[in-house]
């Protein structure tokens, strides 16, 4: 089974077992909802944990796990990653995609390859994709209708029509 990474444990917070997560998932408020199950991976072993609290704090997601009420219970998890089963994903509407479907796609302008989507930034109005280009500076592409012409997640191919000045160098 292919597990889906949803966060990295950046640190602990306070003394009551709260964890500071760097989320790598879309819809964190649904993914880390109280009562949901996530899996912590360590040495190839996936251990289930139930979310007992969730809140946002700056750019971090703060959670506690059921039964883990002290910093000593969770400190050993710093730096580890959290995963979910692929079955935990909800159906999305048309023109909606999960991050893991977009990250790793190759971006083209016509037949010219621009690079590969390496990261998705949430900006509020629309997402912005970071495109890694071999030997060149990264390019930031807004996920808007005027720029993104088509997405084929099966072929891992994205076709864009860049605005003037969007891609330089």
Curated annotation (Swiss-Prot):
One of its GO terms (molecular function) is ribosome binding. GO terms for biological process: ribosomal small subunit biogenesis; rRNA processing. The keyword Cytoplasm applies. Pfam families: PRC, RimM. One of its GO terms (cellular component) is ribosome. It comes from the Bacteria. Residues 93-166 form the PRC barrel domain. Its main location: cytoplasm. The keyword Chaperone applies. Keywords: Chaperone, Cytoplasm, Ribosome biogenesis, rRNA processing. InterPro entries: PRC-brl_dom, PRC_barrel-like_sf, RimM, RimM_N, RimM_N_sf, Transl_B-barrel_sf. It is found in: Cytoplasm. Gene3D superfamilies: PRC-barrel domain, RimM. Signal peptide: none annotated. Binds ribosomal protein uS19. An accessory protein needed during the final step in the assembly of 30S ribosomal subunit, possibly for assembly of the head region. Essential for efficient processing of 16S rRNA. May be needed both before and after RbfA during the maturation of 16S rRNA. It has affinity for free ribosomal 30S subunits but not for 70S ribosomes. Belongs to the RimM family. The PRC barrel domain binds ribosomal protein uS19. This is Ribosome maturation factor RimM. It comes from Exiguobacterium sibiricum (strain DSM 17290 / CCUG 55495 / CIP 109462 / JCM 13490 / 255-15). The lineage of its organism: Bacteria, Bacillati, Bacillota, Bacilli, Bacillales.
């Amino acid at each position: 089974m292919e597990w889906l990474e949803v966060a990295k444990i950046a640190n602990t917070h306070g003394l009551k077992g709260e964890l500071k997560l760097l989320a790598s998932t879309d819809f964190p408020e649904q993914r880390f909802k109280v009562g949901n199950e996530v899996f912590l991976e360590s040495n190839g072993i996936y251990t289930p944990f139930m979310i007992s609290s969730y809140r946002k704090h700056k750019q971090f997601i703060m959670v506690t796990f059921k039964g883990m009420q002290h910093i000593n219970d969770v400190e050993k998890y710093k730096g580890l990653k959290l995963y979910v089963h692929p079955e935990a994903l909800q159906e999305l509407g048309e023109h909606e995609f999960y991050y893991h479907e977009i990250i790793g796609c190759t971006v083209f302008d016509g037949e010219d390859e621009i690079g590969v989507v390496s990261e998705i930034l949430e900006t509020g109005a629309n997402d912005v994709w970071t495109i890694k280009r071999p030997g060149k500076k990264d390019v930031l592409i807004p996920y808007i209708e005027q720029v993104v012409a088509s997405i084929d997640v099966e072929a891992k191919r994205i076709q864009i029509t860049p605005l003037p000045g969007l891609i330089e160098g």
